[in-house]
C-alpha cells in the first residue's frame, strides 16, 4: 500500500461531502492508501460540524447544492475542492488512455453511449462513466484505450485539475434554475469545460448559434462529408434530425482522434439508441406508446415532439419537477404536433401557467392517472408520448423508474 498524493502533494486528511454512489466510489478507492484519514459528511448536520480548515482536500458529490446553506461556505475553500473525476484522472494521467468529456442539456447521453458503442464495435477497449450512471473510480482497475465521460454542469463546477484530451459542449438550453441564478450562469458552467480540455468544440446550433460541424452537413435526412453521402437516418435505428446532429458530433470526435470514419459509420448503423429515450414500447389497436422518460427538460421534449411525427396526433404526458424550466418555448411544437396534454406532478400548476393558452389539457393526480386518461382518449394512428420535460423525483427514484412504470402500464393494457 502507498500514501495518497494529489498533484504531487501528500494528502493526510480528506473530507467526503455526500455519500451516494459517487461518495461511496471515492471512499472505496481511498481505502487502498495508508496514512490517509477520510471523514464523511452524509447530511447537513454532519457538514455543519466539520472544521473545513483541517482538511488537505475536500471531495464533493455533484448532488450537493453549492448555492444553498450550509454548503455555500465551500466557496471559501475552492482550492481544496476536487471531484471524483479529478481523483480518477490523477490515477490514469500517465497512461496512454484518452479521456473524452461531453456535456450539454440534451443529447449528451445519446452521444456518449454511441461513442462507447462504436469504439467497442471497432475493437477498442472503452469505458463509459460519469453522469450517465457509473462513477469512474469504479472502473479504476480496468484497462482501456478510451474513457468516455458524460459530465454535468454540477460536476464541472467541482473540477480542479482534470485534463480531458477532448471536451465537447452540445445543445445548452434552459435547465437547473434551482441551482443557477440564470441561464447565462448555467451556460457558462457548461462552457467552463474548455478550461479542463486539451481540445474543445461546441455544437449548439439551436440555442447559441454556435455550430462546429467540421466537414459534415445534413441534407434531407442524410449526413454528407463534403459531397459524399455517409448515411441516411433510415439506415439507422434512430429517428429525427436531432439524432443526425448527435451523429455529426460523434464523427467530429472520431476525426480528432484519427479514427476511420467509414468503419465508424458502419457501427453507428447498428446502434440501437438509449433506453427511455424516444423508445417505442408497443402499438395497441393502432395507438403507439412511446417512452421518452429521459426527456427531463423542455429542450429534450421539444426535440422529441419535433422528431416522432409529422401530424398533430400526439397525446402528451407532461409534468414532474420543473426545475424552473421555460415552457413557453414549447408553443410551436405543441401547436403543430400535440392534440392533448395530460398534466401531472409537483409543478403542474407552474407548467399550466405557461401552456394554458397553447393547447387543450387536463390536470391529473399523478402519472398513472395521466396515463389512464391518455390511453382512454387515444384513437387509431395517434401516439401516447411520455416526455415529461421535468425531473421525476416527486414520484419516482429517477427517470428510469418513471419509464419502467410507463412501460408496465402499457403492458397491462388489454
Curated annotation (Swiss-Prot):
- Sites binding ATP sit at 104-110
Reaction catalysed by this enzyme: UDP-N-acetyl-alpha-D-muramoyl-L-alanine + D-glutamate + ATP = UDP-N-acetyl-alpha-D-muramoyl-L-alanyl-D-glutamate + ADP + phosphate + H(+)
- One Pfam family matching this protein: Mur_ligase_C
Q: What is its EC number?
A: 6.3.2.9
Q: Quote the subcellular location field of this record.
A: Cytoplasm
Family annotation (InterPro entries): Mur-like_cat_sf, Mur_ligase_C, Mur_ligase_C_dom_sf, Mur_ligase_cen, MurD
Keyword rRNA processing appears in the UniProt entry:
no
Query: Keyword set for this entry?
Result: ATP-binding, Cell cycle, Cell division, Cell shape, Cell wall biogenesis/degradation, Cytoplasm, Ligase, Nucleotide-binding, Peptidoglycan synthesis
UniProt pathway: Cell wall biogenesis; peptidoglycan biosynthesis
List the Gene Ontology MF annotations in alphabetical order: ATP binding; UDP-N-acetylmuramoylalanine-D-glutamate ligase activity
Q: Which GO terms describe its biological process?
A: cell division; cell wall organization; peptidoglycan biosynthetic process; regulation of cell shape
CC per GO annotation: cytoplasm
Q: Which family does it belong to?
A: Belongs to the MurCDEF family.
Q: What does this protein do?
A: Cell wall formation. Catalyzes the addition of glutamate to the nucleotide precursor UDP-N-acetylmuramoyl-L-alanine (UMA).
Give the protein name, as stated in the record: UDP-N-acetylmuramoylalanine--D-glutamate ligase
